[in-house]
Structure formats: structure tokens, C-alpha cells
């Protein structure tokens, strides 16, 4: 959401847009119980609205600054072929040296779980069946919010 501010403050900044399947993303957000710090994540309805709003915002910035303003990385593709994507990310960012999986595993990061940063990239968060009884209503809410944005254009 702060893309333009960052771009103005750091004109040479590179922007990586990592996105994933909306339902998988919703499950992940909901399960983390971010209700105090990320209020919309306390319901699938709130997540659906926020996800559609985020999609609209990304569309806006890509129309404003062109398709090359961001390097788009689909999460599902990243976890299937992480080495290929890591090399693309390094090249896009103009980083010198080589990627080191060993260093990545030793890195400390602030995420929902320290174990998420230190363990190997895993594929178990793709196409989850958790909360399946809410899937259809989530997709309907997501589509309704997408339609809302289309009507405003």
C-alpha cells in the first residue's frame, strides 16, 4: 500500500509482488489469528474484501507505472521451483554473489513463526482443504468485491 511513497523516497528501488491463490492465502491468514493486528483476518468475509481491494490496487499501480514496475512471482510456482525463482529474484535485484541455502536457514527473520524461516521451503500450504465448508462463500464474496471495483471504473 505504500508503493508510491517508497518509489518516491527510493527511486531505484525494486518491487517484488509475490501473490498466491486467494483461498490458500485466506486460510493462512485466518489460522494465524491476527485479529488484534490485522483486523480483517478475523473472518473469511473480511479477507475476501481485502484481497479484492489489494488486487484492484495492484492493477491500478501496474496501469500507472507499467507492467515492469513489479516482478510478479506466483507463490505456487515459487515453492515448486524455488531455485529457479531465487535466481530470478537475485538477477532482478541486481545482487552480487550467489544464493546460499545454508545462510538462508541460519537467517533470523520476524515472521509468524521462526520455524517458517529456518526450515526448507515446503509445499504443504498449497491447495489446502482446511475450512472447505467456507470456500464457496469466500469465493462468492471475493467475486462480489471484484465486481464492485469493475463497476467503479
Q: Across the structure, where does each feature detected by a protein language model lie?
A:
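Long, K/E/R/D-enriched contiguous segments that form extended
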Residues: 1-5
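Conserved phosphate-donor/acceptor-positioning beta-strand/loop module used by diverse small-molecule
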Residues: 6-31, 89
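A secondary-structure boundary/capping signal
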Residues: 19, 74-75
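Acidic, metal-coordinating catalytic cores used for nucleic-acid/nucleotide bond scission
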Residues: 24, 77-81
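PAPS-dependent sulfotransferases, especially Golgi type II membrane carbohydrate sulfotransferases
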Residues: 29-72, 80-153
Amino acid at each position: 500500500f505504500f508503493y508510491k511513497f517508497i518509489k518516491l523516497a527510493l527511486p531505484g528501488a525494486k518491487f517484488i509482488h509475490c501473490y498466491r491463490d486467494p483461498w490458500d492465502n485466506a486460510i493462512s491468514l485466518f489460522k494465524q489469528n491476527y485479529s488484534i493486528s490485522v483486523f480483517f483476518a478475523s473472518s473469511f468475509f473480511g479477507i475476501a474484501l481485502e484481497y479484492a481491494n489489494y488486487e484492484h490496487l495492484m492493477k491500478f499501480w501496474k496501469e500507472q507505472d507499467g507492467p515492469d514496475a513489479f516482478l510478479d512471482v506466483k507463490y505456487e510456482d515459487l515453492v515448486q521451483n524455488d531455485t529457479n525463482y531465487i535466481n530470478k529474484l537475485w538477477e532482478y535485484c541486481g545482487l552480487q554473489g550467489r544464493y546460499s541455502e545454508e545462510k538462508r536457514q541460519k537467517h533470523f527473520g520476524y515472521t509468524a513463526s521462526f520455524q517458517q524461516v529456518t526450515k526448507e521451503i515446503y509445499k504443504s500450504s498449497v491447495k489446502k482443504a482446511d475450512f472447505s465448508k467456507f470456500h464457496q462463500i469466500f469465493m462468492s464474496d471475493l467475486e462480489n468485491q471484484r465486481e464492485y471495483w469493475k463497476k467503479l471504473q
